[in-house]
């Protein structure tokens, strides 16, 4: 009976499906999601810190018009 519990417990469903790593395309791993390795994770972090990635900001022209008056 104790052998059945171990067999059933070893078949755990992952919380999320594996997806391709955004850096290299290999399957992601749970510990470093959405990346496949620490290297790919650090490459992405370096791009954010160096300014390679930027979030576009749209100027709100209605506020600019109000400030001019």
Curated annotation (Swiss-Prot):
Disulfide bonds: none annotated. Residues 1-28 are annotated as: Disordered. InterPro entries: DNA_gyrase_inhibitor_YacG, Znf_NHR/GATA. One of its GO terms (molecular function) is zinc ion binding. Zn(2+) binds at residues 21, 24, 36, 40. Keywords: Metal-binding, Zinc. GO terms for biological process: regulation of DNA-templated transcription. The keyword Zinc applies. It comes from the Bacteria. Binds 1 zinc ion. Transmembrane segments: none annotated. SUPFAM superfamilies: Glucocorticoid receptor-like (DNA-binding domain). Its cofactor is Zn(2+). Inhibits all the catalytic activities of DNA gyrase by preventing its interaction with DNA. Acts by binding directly to the C-terminal domain of GyrB, which probably disrupts DNA binding by the gyrase. PANTHER family: DNA GYRASE INHIBITOR YACG. Interacts with GyrB. Belongs to the DNA gyrase inhibitor YacG family. This is DNA gyrase inhibitor YacG. The lineage of its organism: Bacteria, Pseudomonadati, Pseudomonadota, Alphaproteobacteria, Hyphomicrobiales. The gene is yacG.
